[in-house]
Curated annotation (Swiss-Prot):
The gene is dinB. Monomer. Transmembrane segments: none annotated. This is DNA polymerase IV. It catalyses: DNA(n) + a 2'-deoxyribonucleoside 5'-triphosphate = DNA(n+1) + diphosphate. It comes from the Bacteria. Keywords: Cytoplasm, DNA damage, DNA repair, DNA replication, DNA-binding, DNA-directed DNA polymerase, Magnesium, Metal-binding, Mutator protein, Nucleotidyltransferase, Transferase. One of its GO terms (biological process) is SOS response. CDD domains: PolY_Pol_IV_kappa.
Length: 351
């Protein structure tokens, strides 16, 4: 049985700012955007979250919720330095590390001899070491599979951890809301609820064929997760090549104004996800995806050095006009392709 830890730093960017400037600790702060121009919140500290300020929220909305919010532009070199230090701490316990972004990672400690092989104690020691060496707090989840470890890391935030032992998995899954499973969005959750499926326990009683007919490949993933099955390894060689966000509509759309409104809502989430992986927002390409009512889909992208909403909207409009052919659109997606590390080094040297 595997021992997987998911470590997630607590409001990481904001925490680095509060550590380096103690005057910020007890006031609402957020990273990203400014009062003078439009932007989105990358992360917010817990005092700001009490006012409803959240990641990917437009700055204007955040300021309405919390007029005295302190906005910081972000010091991404400092965040990267802290992230590298945290990664080095992980490596003291295992070589099997899969970074997901600057502030979270999976660790496979199945074969680790530290702390007498106890994943629970390893997670505690890692969190304490991070605090001792960086004065930053982390939350952790421990489980026999990746998706449960990720869910567990959110159970006792901030500065806590939650353990799901192999023996506890069946009972935990019985009442686990399907919306907690990574990949189950609002639209999918609504469709599942309409079928009477709210928890993993409900799905366990459902026929796999029914799920496959309704959800395709995702139906199998949903069925497996509800049984506690997740055979994905912690991949130390994992190199993220793209970042994307998409939305499947409850009803097909037929007007460009509807598509543009969806892009406006998707863009802040794309920006937030990209910032966690590439704080400087440098990219190789960006593009859009439309899936039509006949389940055919089309993708169009441009070479572009930095994430740019205006270009994405223009690309989407061109795709809408030239490729839709009067069909309804059931899905809208935005994505970016990240720079190859070697190419990125060459660009930096060229500067």
């Amino acid at each position: 049985m595997r021992k997987i830890i998911h470590v997630d730093m607590d409001c990481f960017f904001a925490a680095v700012e509060m550590r380096d400037n103690p005057a910020l600790r007890d006031i609402p702060i957020a990273i990203g955007g400014s009062r003078e121009r439009r932007g989105v919140i990358s992360t917010a500290n817990y005092p700001a979250r009490k006012f409803g300020v959240r990641s990917a929220m437009p700055t204007g909305m955040a300021l309405k919720l919390c007029p005295h919010l302190t906005l910081l532009p972000g010091r991404f070199d400092a965040y990267k330095e802290a992230s590298n230090h945290i990664r080095e701490i992980f490596s003291r316990y295992t070589s099997r590390i899969e970074p997901l972004s600057l502030d979270e990672a999976y660790l496979d400690v199945t074969d680790s001899v530290h702390c007498h092989g106890s994943a629970t104690l390893i997670a505690q020691e890692i969190r304490q070491t991070i605090f001792n060496e960086l004065q930053l707090t982390a939350s952790a989840g421990v489980a026999p599979v990746k998706f449960l470890a990720k869910i567990a890391s959110d159970m006792n935030k901030p500065n806590g951890q939650f353990v799901i032992t192999p023996a506890e998995v069946p009972a935990f899954l019985q009442t686990l809301p399907l919306a907690k499973i990574p990949g189950v969005g609002k639209v999918s959750a609504a469709k599942l609820e309409a079928m009477g499926l709210r928890t993993c326990g409900d799905v366990q009683k459902c026929d796999l064929v029914t799920l496959l007919k309704r959800f395709g490949k995702f139906g199998r993933i949903l069925w497996e997760r509800s049984q506690g099955i997740d055979e994905r390894d912690v991949n130390s060689e994992r190199l993220r090549k793209s970042v994307g966000v998409e939305r499947t509509m409850a009803e097909d759309i037929h007007h460009w104004s509807e598509c543009e409104a969806i892009i406006e809502r998707l863009y802040p989430e794309l920006e937030r996800r990209l910032a966690k992986v590439k704080p400087d927002l440098l990219i190789a390409r960006q593009g859009v995806k439309l899936k039509f009512d006949d389940f055919q889909q089309t993708t169009q992208e441009h070479v572009w050095p930095r994430l740019n909403k205006s270009d994405l909207i223009a690309t989407a409009r061109k795709t809408w006009d030239e490729r839709r052919g009067g069909r309804g659109v059931r899905l809208v997606g935005l994505h970016v392709t990240l720079l190859d590390p070697q190419m990125e080094r060459q660009l930096v040297l060229g500067l």
